[in-house]
Structure formats: structure tokens, C-alpha cells
Amino acid sequence: KIYKTLLDIPEERLYITPNGVNTEAFRFTELPIFGHHSIYLAKVDYRKRQHLFQSIKTLYFAGNIADDKFDIETNYLGEWSKEYLYENLTEYGNLVLLSDGEAHPLVIMEAFAAGLGVVISEFATANLDVSKEFITVIPENKIHDIKFVEEQIIKNRDFSINNRHAIIDYSRQFDWVNVIQKHYLPAIQKVIS
């Protein structure tokens, strides 16, 4: 919408490619070690809003710190390397990302590739089938209702733990091979012709 309205670029000249992920890079386990924990994996900054949810006891945080309101003494796991992410993301029950403006964050596709369900803000729903039970969308008008958010995280985690193979199947549409074939190459062909 922004490209069409603010920049006045005609729709036939817009070629938007969704994020893709190397699904084969992620280790998968059916029985995660931290299945009763959720992971909020993102740069810790004000826009990502991690500080709002630190009172949720089963929610753990990973990412580099850029928010002085965030208490690093509460469930903070440090910054993860890509290798650590590939190996360990599958060990959590689900992923939480309640930021205020990312449309199609890569970390969501990474969570799917590791077999995790997601709890996301309404801003992060682009290209997702939100009818899937392992995708929980928190409405913006409920984002400060910590009890509600916690209940939704637990509900999603309980469902996701028992439906990991369905999540892995869903993740395949975001695999780089599929994204390149379905979106990137057709866009290049249109530009060339």
C-alpha cells in the first residue's frame, strides 16, 4: 500500500518477494527440552515491546539489547548466533513476536521451520494463513492486557507442541526454493519482458 499510495508506483511495476528461509538448516525435535517455555527472539528494542511482557514467567528472551527498559536479569538468554538458532530454536514450545510494525518478519518463518507455532501482533500477519491454529494473532487493542496475552501464549504453545509436523509442513511454502520459483523468478521475467 505504501509503495502505491505514497510513492505512486503503479501496481503492475511492484514486485514484492516474501521472506524465505532455508528450512533444511533447522534442527527439528518432536519433544523439545523447553516445551513449557516460549521464546521471544528479536532485537530487544522499544518497537519490539519485549519489556511489556517480562512478567510472563514462561516467556524467555533472546536478542541483542537496544532497550534500556528491558531487565536483563529476567529470563534473558543473551544474543544467539545463527548456528545456535538453527540448532536450538526447536527446543522451545512456541515463538512470540509482538512488535508494532513488521509485516513479514523472517523469524516467524524460522520458527515454522523449527516446528514452532507463533504468537504475533496483527502487524506481522502478511503472507500468513491466520486460520491455522498454531498462528495466534494478538489484536492491538489487547496488547497491554498481559493476562490475555499470557493465556494466548500458553494456549498456542499447548496446541503447537502437539502439532509440530503440521507446522513443519506449513513451513515448506516459505522455503527459499519455493519462494524463488513462485515469486522471485516470475518477477524477474516480468522485468525482463
Stretches found by the model and what they are:
Residues 1-27:
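Donor nucleotide-sugar binding/catalytic pocket of nucleotide-sugar-dependent glycosyltransferases
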Residues 30-48, 54-57:
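Conserved donor-binding/catalytic core segment of Leloir-type glycosyltransferases
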Residues 79, 132-144, 153-158:
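Conserved acidic donor-binding segment of nucleotide-sugar-dependent glycosyltransferases
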Residues 86, 109-113, 127-128:
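Short alpha-helical segment that forms part of, or immediately flanks, the ligand-binding pocket
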Residues 87-92, 184:
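Short alpha-helical donor nucleotide-sugar binding micro-motif in glycosyltransferases
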Residues 117-121, 127:
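Short hydrophobic beta-strand element within catalytic cores of glycosyltransferases
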Residues 141, 157-192:
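A charged, aromatic-enriched C-terminal amphipathic alpha-helix characteristic of glycosyltransferases
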